[in-house]
C-alpha cells in the first residue's frame, strides 16, 4: 500500500492529493505511510506527503511521511457490539426497554457515511416481560438497512465527531408483555452517538481497528439531539395498548458501542482487517 501511494504521489503530484483531502472534518479515512521518492529537480529522494504522524498536522513543505486517503479501503466492513453498560431505550415518560446486548454489522460507504446491514437487540425486557418482534425469538429485535452520517459537534476541546443513525420509515414494530396482553411498540426516527477515544484505543485522530461510539440520554432526552445548526435527530416510540389506547413519546438510547473495522470473512485473517481513522483536526 505504501509503495502504491508513493508512486501515485510521484505521478500526480502533491496538488492531486491536496484536492483528495479537501473534505471538511470530521471524516473517516486512512493515514498512509509513504516511501521516499525523487521529485522533479531533486538530487535525492524525499518524502512528499502532506502530513506528519496521524495526518493531523499539515507539513507546509509537503515533505511529510504520511498522506491522507479519505474513506475506507477494500476491507470496509465493521462489526459493533454494546453490552457494558447494558443498552437501554427510555421514553420521556419513563418507560424502559432494557437489553443485554446490542450489535450491528455493515459497511463504511464513504468518508462520511456507513450502512448498517443488520442491527440486533437481544435479551430485551420491559417491566420484566420480554420484548420481541417474533414470538419464537424471545427478547430479540432486528432492524435492517440503517444509514449513518458522520457530522461535527462543538466540544470543550474543539471539534468532535458523531454518527447519526437514521432509517426511512419505522425501525421496527415489536411486542412487549405477555401473549395474552401485549403492548405493541413502534420505534421510529434517528439518533446521534458521539465518537470517543474509549480507553485510548479508539480511532479519533489516530489509526485504529477499534472505534467507540457513546449514545447518551437522560430520561428519554438524547445528548446531543442535533448537529450544530441542524434539525433535531431523535427517536420516538408509539405504544399501542389493548383495549385501544395509543401514545407517542420521544425516546433516548443509552449504549457504549465498540466497533471493529475491516472485519471481512473470515475475520481472523489479517488481510480482512484494516485500521481506519476519524479525523477531526483541520486539513492541509
Question: Which residue ranges define each predicted feature?
Answer:
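Extracytosolic secretory-pathway proteins
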Residues: 23-284
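Sec/Tat signal peptide C-region and signal peptidase I cleavage site
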Residues: 17-23
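Bacterial N-terminal signal peptides
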Residues: 4-15
Amino acid at each position: 500500500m505504501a509503495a502504491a501511494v508513493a508512486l501515485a504521489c510521484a505521478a500526480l503530484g502533491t496538488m492531486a492529493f491536496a484536492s483528495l483531502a479537501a473534505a471538511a472534518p470530521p471524516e473517516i479515512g486512512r493515514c498512509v505511510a509513504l516511501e521516499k521518492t525523487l521529485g522533479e529537480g531533486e538530487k535525492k529522494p524525499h518524502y512528499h506527503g502532506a502530513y506528519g504522524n496521524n495526518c493531523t498536522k499539515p507539513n507546509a513543505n509537503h515533505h511529510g511521511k504520511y498522506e491522507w486517503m479519505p474513506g475506507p479501503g477494500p476491507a470496509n466492513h465493521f462489526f459493533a457490539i454494546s453490552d457494558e453498560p447494558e443498552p437501554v431505550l427510555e421514553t420521556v415518560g419513563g418507560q424502559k426497554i432494557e437489553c443485554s446486548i446490542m450489535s450491528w454489522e455493515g459497511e463504511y460507504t464513504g468518508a462520511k457515511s456507513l450502512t448498517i446491514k443488520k442491527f440486533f437487540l437481544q435479551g430485551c425486557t420491559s417491566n420484566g416481560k420480554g420484548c420481541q418482534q417474533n414470538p419464537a425469538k424471545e427478547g430479540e429485535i432486528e432492524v435492517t438497512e440503517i444509514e449513518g452520517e458522520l457530522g461535527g459537534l462543538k466540544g470543550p476541546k474543539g471539534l468532535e465527531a458523531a454518527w447519526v443513525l437514521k432509517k426511512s420509515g419505522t425501525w421496527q414494530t415489536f411486542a412487549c408483555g405477555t401473549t395474552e396482553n401485549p403492548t405493541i411498540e413502534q420505534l421510529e426516527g434517528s439518533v446521534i452517538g458521539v465518537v470517543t477515544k474509549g480507553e485510548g484505543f479508539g480511532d479519533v485522530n489516530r489509526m485504529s481497528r477499534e472505534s467507540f461510539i457513546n449514545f447518551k440520554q437522560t430520561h428519554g432526552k438524547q445528548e446531543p439531539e442535533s448537529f450544530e445548526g441542524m434539525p433535531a435527530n431523535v427517536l420516538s416510540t408509539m405504544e399501542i395498548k389493548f383495549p385501544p389506547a395509543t401514545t407517542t413519546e420521544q425516546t433516548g438510547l443509552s449504549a457504549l458501542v465498540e466497533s471493529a473495522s475491516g472485519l471481512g470473512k473470515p475475520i481472523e485473517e489479517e488481510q480482512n482487517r484494516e485500521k481506519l481513522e476519524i479525523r477531526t483536526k483541520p486539513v492541509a
